[in-house]
Curated annotation (Swiss-Prot):
Family recorded in the similarity comment: Belongs to the ATPase alpha/beta chains family.
Organism this protein belongs to: Shewanella sp. (strain MR-4)
Pfam families: ATP-synt_ab, ATP-synt_ab_N, ATP-synt_VA_C
Record CDD domains: ATP-synt_F1_beta_C, ATP-synt_F1_beta_N, F1-ATPase_beta_CD
Function: Produces ATP from ADP in the presence of a proton gradient across the membrane. The catalytic sites are hosted primarily by the beta subunits.
Catalytic activity: ATP + H2O + 4 H(+)(in) = ADP + phosphate + 5 H(+)(out)
Gene3D superfamilies assigned to the protein according to its UniProt record, in alphabetical order: 2.40.10.170, Bovine Mitochondrial F1-atpase, Atp Synthase Beta Chain, Chain D, domain 3 (1.10.1140.10), P-loop containing nucleotide triphosphate hydrolases (3.40.50.300)
GO cellular component annotations of the record: plasma membrane; proton-transporting ATP synthase complex
Subunit organization: F-type ATPases have 2 components, CF(1) - the catalytic core - and CF(0) - the membrane proton channel. CF(1) has five subunits: alpha(3), beta(3), gamma(1), delta(1), epsilon(1). CF(0) has three main subunits: a(1), b(2) and c(9-12). The alpha and beta chains form an alternating ring which encloses part of the gamma chain. CF(1) is attached to CF(0) by a central stalk formed by the gamma and epsilon chains, while a peripheral stalk is formed by the delta and b chains.
Record-listed ATP binding positions: G152, G153, A154, G155, V156, G157, K158, T159
Subcellular location: Cell inner membrane
Protein keywords: ATP synthesis, ATP-binding, Cell inner membrane, Cell membrane, CF(1), Hydrogen ion transport, Ion transport, Membrane, Nucleotide-binding, Translocase, Transport
Protein name (record): ATP synthase subunit beta
EC number(s) per entry: 7.1.2.2
Length: 463
């Protein structure tokens, strides 16, 4: 192991000089040997500047760093603990425990920079993953081993939706999950930990946090740390869920690092390597013939603009997109998923079956027609509509309300118990509304219920 010395410190960027014959490779992990808080600080090599000098990004605060400190080259990239020892634990980007519950006690460590599985190793089966959330199962069904994006602006419910998905899937499918908190609020990370503890599924979740207050290096690499842990479970032949909250902060950390390294920015100030950085992460999230990784990624949409380069680049990698709408949230309909904007490759009669496809299509057609009629209603009122259009509006309003659902993880706020609705019940309910079977039931009865039977029961009670 070669040693070098710190020659320049500019915030999170640290230049280190090594002997000419022992220059570290790009992505090698270096360790500071010093006193106080900076002792043991890990640096990741980003560039070789020539003359034995490498430019690195600090994986922690650079407070207390000074020129002349000794640096040791580990000779390999950052490695993190993997395997069942990580379940129920909270770790940082380096795989160190931050939950004060002792050492991880892992049997194996993987480096976080790995290549994606080859074409012949990848699997191509399409099996649906039931989430128990009506609007998702109906309009944008998830595939086992697929990639899903939860798109939304600030405060429309991305994290709550993600927590409900973890809760439902962990309970219904008893699968293992890895949660990577990338640049999100520490409070949310804390809430998530206790939510999992109270639900009794903590021993099936590994948590890796690199929160908002941490340096850009941590936030850029924490998604890779979580992914590496998920890859180990997949390679053992398990079906694993990878939750990333929030993939936009991963892009943002890349932008900060890119600027710190002096690269010329591209569109809207993003890093010129945006597509490549996103591809490196997303191509590794895939299913092989041994096991599957199903990933759900929250994607913050800056200023609710889906054409922003960051969400636009993410779109290309996803199988299903769940778009959360501020207008739907303002109506008090939660989850605030837009059924007309959300898409899924699985919504195909050959995959989901003809009945499911027809019902989903019918729901979207009715809602689209209602959207077109809203302007006429606003100007002329309901009385000017034809009988057919009046019926369409009535059914569309029932569908809108029936798309809402009480969540298990939101019981604390709403006071109503959460509901898991099977796909069969979801299709039956919407099919009934479309066929006119429930035309006699007032629209209020469809709001915040689980299955259609609950809506009927609610209507009977009101009588």
């Amino acid at each position: 192991m070669s040693t070098g010395t710190v020659v320049q410190v500019i915030g999170a960027v640290v230049d280190v000089e090594f002997p000419q014959d022992a220059v570290p490779q790009v992505y090698d992990a270096l360790k500071i040997v010093g006193e106080g808080s900076c002792n043991g600080l890990v640096l990741e090599v980003q560039q070789q500047l020539g003359g034995g000098v490498v430019r690195t990004i600090a994986m922690g605060t650079s407070d207390g760093l000074r020129r002349g400190l000794e640096v040791v080259n580990s000779g390999s990239p950052i490695s993190v603990p993997v395997g069942t020892a990580t379940l129920g634990r909270i770790m940082n980007v380096l795989g160190e425990p931050i939950d004060e519950a002792g050492a991880i006690g892992e049997e194996e460590r993987y480096v976080i920079h790995r290549s994606a599985p080859s074409y012949e190793d990848q699997s191509n089966t399409t099996e649906l993953l039931e989430t128990g959330i009506k609007v998702i199962d109906l309009v944008c069904p998830f595939a086992k081993g697929g990639k899903v994006g939860l798109f939304g602006g600030a405060g429309v419910g991305k994290t709550v939706n993600m927590m409900e998905l973890i809760n439902n899937i962990a309970k219904a499918h008893s699968g293992l999950s890895v949660f990577a908190g990338v640049g999100e609020r520490t409070r949310e990370g804390n809430d998530f930990y206790y939510e999992m503890k109270d639900s009794g599924v903590l021993d099936k979740v590994a948590m890796v946090y690199g929160q908002m207050n941490e340096p850009p290096g941590n936030r850029l690499r924490v998604a890779l740390t979580g992914l590496t842990m998920a890859e180990k479970f997949r390679d053992e032949g398990r079906d694993v869920l990878l939750f990333v909250d929030n993939i936009y902060r991963y892009t943002l950390a890349g932008t900060e690092v890119s600027a710190l390294l002096g690269r010329m920015p591209s569109a809207v100030g993003y890093q010129p390597t945006l597509a490549e950085e996103m591809g490196v992460l997303q191509e590794r999230i895939t299913s092989t013939k041994t096991g599957s990784i199903t990933s759900v990624q929250a994607v913050y949409v800056p200023a609710d603009d889906l054409t922003d380069p960051s969400p636009a680049t993410t779109f290309a990698h996803l199988d299903a997109t769940v778009v959360l709408s501020r207008q739907i949230a303002s109506l008090g309909i939660y989850p605030a998923v837009d059924p007309l904007d959300s898409t899924s490759r699985q919504l195909d009669p050959l995959v989901v079956g003809q009945e499911h496809y027809d019902v989903a299509n019918g729901v979207q057609t009715v809602l689209q027609r209602y959207k077109e009629l809203k302007d006429i209603i606003a100007i002329l009122g309901m009385d000017e509509l034809s009988d057919d259009d009046k019926m369409t509006v009535s059914r569309a309003r029932k569908i809108e309300r029936f798309l809402s659902q009480p969540f298990h993880v939101a019981e604390v706020f709403t006071g109503s118990p959460g509901k898991y609705v099977s796909l069969k019940d979801t299709i039956r309910g919407f099919k009934g509304i479309l066929s006119g079977e429930f035309d006699h039931i007032p629209e209020q009865a469809f709001y915040m219920v689980g299955s259609i039977d609950e809506a009927v029961e609610k209507a009977n009670k009101k009588k």
